[in-house]
Amino acid sequence: MSVFSVLEREYLGGQRLGRLATVGPDGAPHVVPVSFAYNGSLDTIDIGGHALADSKKWRDIGRDPRVAFVVDDLLPPWRPRMVEIRGQASRLGDAGASLGPGFADELIRITPTRIVSFGLDGTRDLRARNVGSAADQR
């Protein structure tokens, strides 16, 4: 069973750009736009890019795997929607090509520990829940 709701999976499947936040060596956050795909077979978020292994986000995750990831948009007239995923990131050196042509071999994979979503069902109700172990919730 997926940690994501049906609406969350549908929303993530229809989006290609999100924002990844990592923790820098001095503890400061670093946020960048990234291309991604929801990996339904592993229930993870897979992030690819060009020269990913040379990036600050790649180095940050090597030091501290805690990340936050947000996908959001705005429908007219003013209907915000979003999914926020907090979790643990892994660096994989040989899976990026699975995202499509033009992506580096490297891939960042986020395993969710907390999911927050809003506006996916047309209401303003916030849905938040922990989905990982207590040790991962820090």
Describe the residue ranges of each PLM region.
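Structural motif
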Residues: 42-44, 66, 88, 114
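A structural signal for short, well-ordered beta-strand segments
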Residues: 36, 87-89, 110-112
